[in-house]
UniProtKB/Swiss-Prot annotation:
Chief subcellular location: Golgi
Annotated family: Belongs to the SFT2 family.
Keywords assigned: Acetylation, Golgi apparatus, Membrane, Phosphoprotein, Protein transport, Transmembrane, Transmembrane helix, Transport
Name of the protein: Protein transport protein SFT2
Note: Present with 279 molecules/cell in log phase SD medium.
Signal peptide: none
Observed effect of gene inactivation: Lack of SFT2 is lethal in a strain lacking GOT1.
Described function: Nonessential protein required for the fusion of transport vesicles derived from the endocytic pathway with the Golgi complex. Can be partially replaced by GOT1.
Source species, domain of life: Eukaryota
The UniProt record lists the keyword Acetylation: yes
Amino acid sequence: MSEEPPSDQVNSLRDSLNRWNQTRQQNSQGFNESAKTLFSSWADSLNTRAQDIYQTLPVSRQDLVQDQEPSWFQLSRTERMVLFVCFLLGATACFTLCTFLFPVLAAKPRKFGLLWTMGSLLFVLAFGVLMGPLAYLKHLTARERLPFSMFFFATCFMTIYFAAFSKNTVLTITCALLELVAVIYYAISYFPFGATGLRMLSSAGVNSARGVLRI
C-alpha cells in the first residue's frame, strides 16, 4: 500500500483548513447580517415610538389645561372664585329665606322644598365651579364619594318631583329632610377629621340601633 507524499498531505491539510475558514467566515457574515437587520428594525421601532410619545407630550401649560378641561370650561382663578362666592351667596340666601320664612312656608311645604333644594344644589355645585366641571365630576363619582352623590342628587330630584309634579306634601317633606342630612354630611366631611368623625358617629348609631332592636 503506497503512502501519500508529505507534500500531498500538507496540501490536503491546507485545503481542509481553508475550507473550514471559509465556512466559518460565511457563518460569521450571516450572523452579523442577521444581527444588523434585527438591531436596525429594533432601532427603527424604538425611534418611531419615541416620536409618537414626543408628539403627544404637552409643550406648554396651555396644552395641559386643554387636556383637563374643554375650551368652554376654561376659566381663570379669579372668575372661578367669583362664581364660587356667587353660588355660595345664592345658597345662603335660599337657606336664609327658608329659615326666616318658615312660619309662612310651613303652610306651603312644597314651595319650601323647592327653595331648600335650590339652595342645596347651589351649595354643592359651588365646589364644582371652583374645582372645574370635569375634575369635580370625577371627584363626585369616585368610589368613596359615589354613594353620597347618588343619595344627594336622588333626594334633590325626588324633592323637585314630589313638590312640582306629584304635589305630594308628605313625600316632599321627607325628601327635603333626607336632603338636609346629605348636605350636612357633605359639609362636615370636608372639615379636618370630619369624615372620620362621621364614620365613628354612624357606626355608633348603627350599633345603638342594633342594641335597641336586638339585631
